[in-house]
Amino acid sequence: MLDAFSRVVVNSDAKAAYVGGSDLQALKKFIADGNKRLDSVNAIVSNASCIVSDAVSGMICENPGLIAPGGNCYTNRRMAACLRDGEIILRYVSYALLAGDPSVLEDRCLNGLKETYIALGVPTNSSVRAVSIMKAAAVAFITNTASQRKMATADGDCSALASEVASYCDRVAAAIS
């Protein structure tokens, strides 16, 4: 897992060069946007259970067969596993947002996820839909457009952070499908 600083150092070291130029400017911007980044992560984690439960509910509303006998969310145990997986995915998305780097998401969450879901018979289209609902909710909390906010968000334009979290959710969807 690399954070924004480690990534710059590793890249500079690989080139046998000092950290400078555009890398240094990118780090300055990363630091300047630090409070927005922390507030964005806080917005996600403070609303995580709502984000995940809404995503799973939305997925089920669109595919009621999931809760019918034989469906992948039928029985409390399977529903709990679905909610747990959503929480884990969202947690790693928040880690990636905090670090400013997707490697923690890729290495510790997405690596082998599709194969696991296939082996368990989890319908990928429903999982992708749940992730897209989580993406929309996370972006709404970051951009302060969510209707049920629990906390205030940072002042200023957070569209870059919203785009960043959206890209992490897109990575999850791509890894599952």
UniProtKB/Swiss-Prot annotation:
What Pfam families has UniProt attached to this entry? Phycobilisome
Give binding positions for (2R,3E)-phycoerythrobilin 1.
C82
GO CC entries: chloroplast thylakoid membrane; phycobilisome
The yes or no answer to whether the keyword Zinc is present is: no
Q: Where does the protein end up?
A: Plastid, Chloroplast thylakoid membrane
Q: List residues binding phycourobilin.
A: C50, C61
Q: How does it assemble?
A: Heterodimer of an alpha and a beta chain.
Q: What does this protein do?
A: Light-harvesting photosynthetic bile pigment-protein from the phycobiliprotein complex.
Show the PANTHER family listed in the entry.
C-PHYCOCYANIN BETA SUBUNIT, PHYCOBILISOME 32.1 KDA LINKER POLYPEPTIDE, PHYCOCYANIN-ASSOCIATED, ROD 2-RELATED
Which protein, by its recorded name, is this? R-phycoerythrin beta chain
Q: What is the source species?
A: Pyropia tenera
